[in-house]
């Protein structure tokens, strides 16, 4: 059985309350780990009550999370992990460059991802993983003018004032209950931050899987991942991979209308075996009924 879950409902319908109930049950009745991506800071009191770690991430905090951290076992069945990691990095540059990310840029990014990771993989994942700072340096070494466009566009997020994901991770993420609070991350960093933290969570899932430990992942406001193609592909891949690594993933959102405009989001909804629908707006209710083939009676 696919244990992944989607919870939908308008603001105030009880989504957060139902998730908190489930988290409490998991913590009190199992030895599993629970990881929460919390864009609104809604889970902070509960995390504190259960002795969990609250990692507060903002442009002004001292917390650093390396966007390019990668655990052994990142890809399926011993396959080359770089195609998947390259897609993740492309999703980051998609946030940075928006509609200006062209085919030439994508080729350069893929080439440079291969270059900075090969030594790390060849070493058996020993030592420090590369960082976005290393990647930017590799991009600058490329001869194409498009490479310089990439390096300049990414400067704010790599060597500028919003560089919190461009350096080595400096925070302990090993508490059984860990929440990533990104309430104060700011508009510019929020989409990129959600991607990086979700990637960090995925690396933790891999660690736990290799240690024989189950992980529950709760992602609030996950509809944001369906705004951009590469981010969508990354989220869908993680949605599939987490359950293969003894994890359960829950997506939570009130933006049902936004999800229903995405073909991939509709596919997720139509193929989820565990779907919780709380109070919906009239238009969303009708659209969900049509998508899921729910009759009026």
Which residues make up each language-model segment?
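P-loop NTPase motor domains
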Residues: 1, 41-53, 57-61, 66-247, ...
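Hydrophobic "anchor" residues on beta-strands that sit immediately upstream
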Residues: 34, 216, 250
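Conserved AAA+ ATPase "sensor/coupling" helix adjacent to the nucleotide-binding pocket
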Residues: 71, 291-296
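Conserved beta-strand-loop-alpha-helix hinge in the C-terminal portion
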Residues: 282-292
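Glycine-rich phosphate-binding loop of nucleotide-binding enzymes
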Residues: 1-59
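A short helix-turn-beta junction within AAA+ P-loop NTPase domains corresponding to the substrate/partner-engaging
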Residues: 51-55, 263-278
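H-loop/switch region of ABC-family ATPase nucleotide-binding domains
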Residues: 253-254
